[in-house]
Amino acid sequence: MSDLTLAQWQHKAAHLTLPSQAFINGSYRDAVNGATFDCINPANGKLLTKVAACDAADAELAVQAARDAFNDKRWSGLPPKQRKQIMQRFAELMRLNKVELALLESLDMGKPIGDAMGYDAPAAANCIAWNAEAIDKIYDQVAPVEESALALVTREALGVVAAIVPWNFPLVMACWKLGPALATGNSVILKPSEKSPLTALRIAGLAKEAGIPDGVFNVLPGFGHTVGEALAMHMDVDCITFTGSTKIGKHLVECSGKSNLKRAFMECGGKSPNIILADAPDLDAAAKSAAGAIFYNQGEVCTAASRLLVQNSIKPQFMERLLAHAREWISANPLDPATRIGAMVDHIQMEQVLRYIEIGKQEGAKLLLGGNRTNMESGGFYIEPTIFDDVTPQMRIFREEIFGPVLAVTGFDTLEEAITLGNDTDYGLAAAIWTADLNKAVKGSRALRAGTVFVNNWDGGDMTMPFGGFKQSGNGRDKSLHALEKYTELKSTWIQLE
């Protein structure tokens, strides 16, 4: 299917059934108030479908269904082996429906179909399968105490988990939350972004088909200020887990404090530095990686390497290589398998990125590439790959998350200066350092205040590695066995023996 042509993908899109209803207690249904919102195709600005706009009334129904499912143990009370088998079946159904899920993802948020087929759809299924395998490998502990007692340390499911996920990787981010939450026995209410809700709605039906009991997995499309707020403030939600902007993350933490002090795990924004030292083992590979690290997924990536720090002694030749690779990233129709940069998710995001480009010009940064809207005849929301040089730490394009294909380049002389520049941010999600010197690699990776540090690569890793940030990039971790800890309570039981 990855060998389909643009015309073939367009034919499939024209005959695709688009999910549009909420999923509550095992059934698709309209919002209680009957309201809907428009789901727009970023590639052409046209209406895809109208989706149920849930609010507090729908949240109440979903929370009650999730709580009932948790209390009667229809999921958490199943033998681990059985839950594992059901989740494995869920993952397999996602794999069998890979083409549909990838197409929904591309149509809904504008990412290239090649990326949706090559990464998003398979990675989401792999996440569910990986967490399924972990279910019967979570062991409790016996504490070392005197012989007259038995001390147990056990983990139990939290209860009802509300997961609010972003629009840039809607399917993968949903599964990063859903996988470990289900694996540990919780009931889940998923609130996808109103900008890209379709894959979340589709996998709800696949979960039911796989055998996940009614009420255990619910999906509420709608807006953050309505249904999202209702979930965050609900007294019977035990955990709110979120990926999105730092601003909204802070608000959700406040909601936790104002309600029932529910667990609040926030994975937020980033302004990640990519440090290129003069002794990088392969400058061309580093330049190629640097282009991909900012332009992949239209730059709509929380870990995007949006700050490129290049040692001045190699900066001229490195920039020449970078520009050559950057010119290979051309904004085009997301359904064309050759496309590397698709459309921005909507008109609002496109305008925000264009504003930052103007800010960069006004601040005195040197525009080397791009900087314009493109493909306007399509009606879609496209921006050229953009590179600014001579960016100083005082500039807004150095400090603020743009969330688009805009790269800020800054020179430096020493490793110490690069680390200072790299850490000069409110965020701490990711960083990279390119060097052939092991001592510099270790020193740099230890000094950089980021949840993930890449050495001689960008965005390496798999499900075994935790993902999350330092500072205002959030708390808690997705992926790996550490993610399972977020969705459990730790219980101590002391048994006095005779």
Region locations from a protein language model:
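Terminal low-complexity tails and localization/encapsulation signals of metabolic enzymes
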Residues: 1-51, 85, 89, 138-164, ...
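Residue-level signal for inorganic ion chemistry
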Residues: 45, 83, 105, 185, ...
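Conserved C-terminal structural/oligomerization subdomain of aldehyde/semialdehyde dehydrogenase
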Residues: 46-49, 237, 330, 357, ...
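Short, well-ordered beta-strand elements within core beta-sheets of diverse protein domains
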Residues: 48-54, 71-75, 163, 274-278, ...
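Glycine-rich loop-to-alpha-helix module at the N-terminal edge of alpha/beta enzyme cores
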Residues: 48-138
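Rossmann-like NAD(P) dinucleotide-binding subdomain of oxidoreductase/dehydrogenase enzymes
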Residues: 139-285, 412
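A short hydrophobic/small-residue beta-strand
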Residues: 187-189, 367, 452
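ALDH superfamily catalytic-core signature
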Residues: 239, 247-392, 455
